[in-house]
Amino acid sequence: MTKIGINGFGRIGRNVFRAALNNSEVEVVAINDLTDAKTLAHLLKYDTVHGTLNAEVSANENSIVVNGKEIKVIAERDPAQLPWSDYGVEVVVESTGRFTKKSDAEKHLGGSVKKVIISAPASDEDITVVMGVNHEQYDAANHNVVSNASCTTNCLAPFAKVLNEKFGVKRGMMTTIHSYTNDQQILDLPHKDLRRARAAAENMIPTSTGAAKAVALVLPELKGKLNGGAVRVPTANVSLVDLVVELDKEVTVEEVNAAFKAAAEGELKGILGYSEEPLVSIDYNGCTASSTIDALSTMVMEGNMVKVLSWYDNETGYSNRVVDLAAYMTSKGL
């Protein structure tokens, strides 16, 4: 069982913890966050979006206790000073959002810590991995600081892979209709992005995303072929990728959906979902898949222009992939 330390117990950190509770291959043994243990325990137990955690949760002065198991809580600003080895931590999940450069994230390495997973797009990382897409490229000997990409790249890449392998992708444009996140203001307040400065729960907010271009990190054959943007919307969770692509081959809606369904039931099972139900965003709250095709929305125009919608719980799905990645890396050797 892999021992995990979580650096940053925010939305993703806590959802990684929840996901780890349901995975017998990993266990969280230590958490680093500047917030006190009592507050962290309360926020773990009670969640507006995901509901009350089905576990006994309490707090001591420097630890939280979940189902009788004590997890140490540290409050250290400098990653290089963290005593991960005192608790046997082997993999650190870096989820503060602050240490996304390799030069910062690698400060966790040393002692018992063999690998770092950055729960965000990174810079200078050893490899970016999207489970189900390029995880087999992970090389334990050379990859120590690993990015799990973004939630949106984790949604887009699996079905872009299917489209490209089955029909060939010439080019495409993506929009993610994305729930608001902590990188927006709840009321109109200063922000470096003047649109994200506006009240998140009251506005649809056009903004940027690097998710489409980042697909090339895990699918090099699509480099330069995809681009896109985001619209942040007034929902607290669950997002939707809208992809329009021009394919090499002429296809029908039925052929495209059949390819998605086959992948969802086969090589991408658990990663890519497929639905023919007339569902809405709240129905995907808590969905552990990275991406779920909304088959009723698939459209084809003039044979080779295809529009695809795919849902994702941008917290739960992504956090489950972080845990899956940690388990996979361990299976290949730390």
UniProtKB/Swiss-Prot annotation:
Q: Name one GO cellular component term.
A: cytoplasm
Active-site residues from the entry: 151 (nucleophile)
Q: What class of enzyme is it?
A: oxidoreductase
Name the CDD domains on file.
Answer: GAPDH_I_C, GAPDH_I_N
Pathway listed: Carbohydrate degradation; glycolysis; pyruvate from D-glyceraldehyde 3-phosphate: step 1/5
Q: Site described as Activates thiol group during catalysis, positions?
A: 178
What is the stated purpose of this protein?
Catalyzes the oxidative phosphorylation of glyceraldehyde 3-phosphate (G3P) to 1,3-bisphosphoglycerate (BPG) using the cofactor NAD. The first reaction step involves the formation of a hemiacetal intermediate between G3P and a cysteine residue, and this hemiacetal intermediate is then oxidized to a thioester, with concomitant reduction of NAD to NADH. The reduced NADH is then exchanged with the second NAD, and the thioester is attacked by a nucleophilic inorganic phosphate to produce BPG.
Quote the protein name from its UniProt record: Glyceraldehyde-3-phosphate dehydrogenase 1
**Organism listed in the record:** Bacillus cereus
